[in-house]
A protein has these predicted regions:
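Receiver (REC) domain active-site loop signature in two-component systems and cognate sites
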Residues: 58
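As written
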Residues: 49, 63, 94-100
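Two-component/phosphorelay signaling modules centered on CheY-like receiver
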Residues: 14-32, 119
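Acidic, metal-coordinating helix/loop segments flanking the phosphotransfer/catalytic sites
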Residues: 33-51
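Active-site T/S-Asp motif of two-component receiver
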Residues: 54-55
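Acidic catalytic/metal-coordinating carboxylates
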Residues: 35-36, 62-66
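C-terminal output helix
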Residues: 89, 107-117
Length: 123
């Protein structure tokens, strides 16, 4: 028996969080959503997460800071960052740090789907 791969969504915008969770489930993945980086880091789902979708601009800890914290703790998760305020310098830094994709909101569903599928190990 195989279980569905878990995609965690971290975004302070409830509408975006819920829509991403529904989209991931429609693609056949399991999905959990969190309102903050702290909520995700404290979650039992942290170690089950196969791919992380995180907002760049969140209070307290940004998506970039969350990714760096995961890397520093030896728990790098394939990460897709999303933002309503894209910045080339931030994108370049994030990609150089190892972030898989840096996408602009509103997110293009096909582009996001391609990024998620690229993050998943081959079956």
């Amino acid at each position: 028996m195989t279980s569905k791969q878990l995609i965690s969504v971290v975004d302070d915008d409830r509408f975006f969080r819920d829509s991403m969770r529904r989209l991931m489930r429609s693609l056949g993945y399991s999905s959990e959503a969190f309102a903050s980086a702290a909520d995700f880091l404290a979650s039992p789902f942290l170690f089950e997460t196969a791919c992380l979708i995180a907002d760049v601009n969140m209070p307290a800890m940004t998506g970039i800071e969350l990714y760096r914290r995961l890397v520093e703790s030896k728990r790098a998760i394939p990460t897709i960052l999303v933002t309503a305020y894209p910045n080339d310098d931030d994108r370049i830094r994030a990609e150089n740090d190892g972030v898989l994709c840096y996408l602009r909101k509103p997110v293009n569903e096909q582009e996001l789907t391609d990024c998620v599928r690229g993050a998943m190990p081959a079956a």
